[in-house]
């Protein structure tokens, strides 16, 4: 770990950030596992990792990370998130949204892209807060580091 912090903080932090941002929740603990079994000669970073986060209120969030897929692999670079609750579920994948609830299956239009850099500059110039705060970024970073520690030790890590 002196030269590579781990695949969870490097690749998984983005999904961790989404989970925190979209749920508005907080993590209470994490368990994780990882493998470098597919790495060439065993000398490479972890190629896959899984993390299970427990959240305040009892919700669970799972994270799957993979690395070193071939560039032509159909899932290379794909990102997705799925949230399931008592009134339905929403899934974002392949640049589209699927909402399933009591009204059936819907495919709402995507929201326009948010330019987070412009958002950041606006905060500097006007003081209007960014959509994402520094505290939220630090929370995601802490969660990624703790998830990597859980994967490295095989222990459940409490927040």
Predicted feature residues:
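Predominantly a Rossmann-like dinucleotide-binding segment in NAD(P)-dependent oxidoreductases
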Residues: 1-43, 154
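Active-site rim elements
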Residues: 4-7, 105, 126-131
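NAD(P)-dinucleotide binding in Rossmann-like oxidoreductases
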Residues: 40-46, 55-117
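Short glycine/threonine-rich loop-to-helix capping motif typified by GTGT followed
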Residues: 44-49, 149
């Amino acid at each position: 770990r002196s030269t590579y912090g781990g695949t969870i903080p490097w690749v998984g932090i983005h999904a961790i950030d989404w989970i925190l941002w979209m749920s508005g929740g907080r993590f209470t603990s994490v368990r994780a596992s990882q493998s470098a079994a597919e790495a060439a000669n065993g000398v490479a970073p972890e190629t896959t990792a899984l993390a299970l986060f427990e959240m305040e209120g009892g919700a669970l969030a799972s994270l799957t990370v993979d690395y070193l897929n071939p560039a032509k692999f159909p899932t290379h670079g794909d990102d997705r998130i799925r949230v399931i609750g008592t009134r339905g579920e929403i899934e974002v994948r392949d640049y589209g949204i699927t909402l399933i609830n009591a009204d059936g299956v819907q495919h709402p239009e995507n929201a326009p892209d948010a330019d987070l850099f412009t958002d950041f500059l606006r905060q500097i110039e006007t003081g209007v807060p960014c959509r994402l705060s520094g505290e939220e970024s630090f929370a995601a970073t802490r969660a990624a580091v703790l998830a990597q520690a859980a994967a490295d030790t095989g222990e459940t890590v409490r927040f």
